[in-house]
């Protein structure tokens, strides 16, 4: 199972190939979502899988919640008919790139010596490592104050 909610939110470098794109035996289920690129409150996703796997997945999904909201599906369908989703994704990638650059700048200026972090090329997260003796709770509380 490949869960890829942030795959389209790439703002640097090449888009990484999915495991599904390399799957020659039909073993990978690819899970995507509209909530990260379209509307956070719209809990609507999609699955790409082998036909036999998908039919079993549908049974499991139906036993879990009967069906996905028809209204939510209609909203997503109407949006994709009326607007260019790729252009929208490009726009939000620019926004997230700007936010990433800003947080990296603030971290460089404000965090204590010895802290290290990743430089994300996409998505919404980064990984911060702090030196021994630095309280993660105190850093967290300081961030909340800002």
Residues covered by each model-derived region:
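PLP-dependent class I/II
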Residues: 1-146
């Amino acid at each position: 199972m490949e869960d890829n909610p942030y795959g389209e939110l790439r703002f640097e470098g090449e888009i990484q190939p999915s495991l599904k794109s390399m799957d020659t035996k039909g073993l990978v289920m690819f899970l995507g979502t509209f909530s990260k690129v379209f509307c956070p409150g719209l809990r609507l996703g999609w699955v790409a899988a082998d036909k036999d796997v998908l039919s079993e997945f549908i049974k499991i999904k139906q036993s879990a919640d009967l069906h996905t909201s028809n209204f939510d599906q209609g909203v997503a369908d109407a949006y994709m008919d009326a607007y260019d989703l790729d252009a929208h994704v490009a726009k939000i990638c620019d926004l997230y790139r700007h936010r990433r650059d800003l947080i990296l700048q603030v971290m460089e200026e404000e965090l204590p010596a010895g802290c290290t972090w990743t430089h994300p090329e996409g998505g919404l997260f980064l990984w911060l490592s702090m030196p021994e003796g630095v309280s993660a709770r105190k850093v967290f509380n300081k961030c909340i104050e800002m």
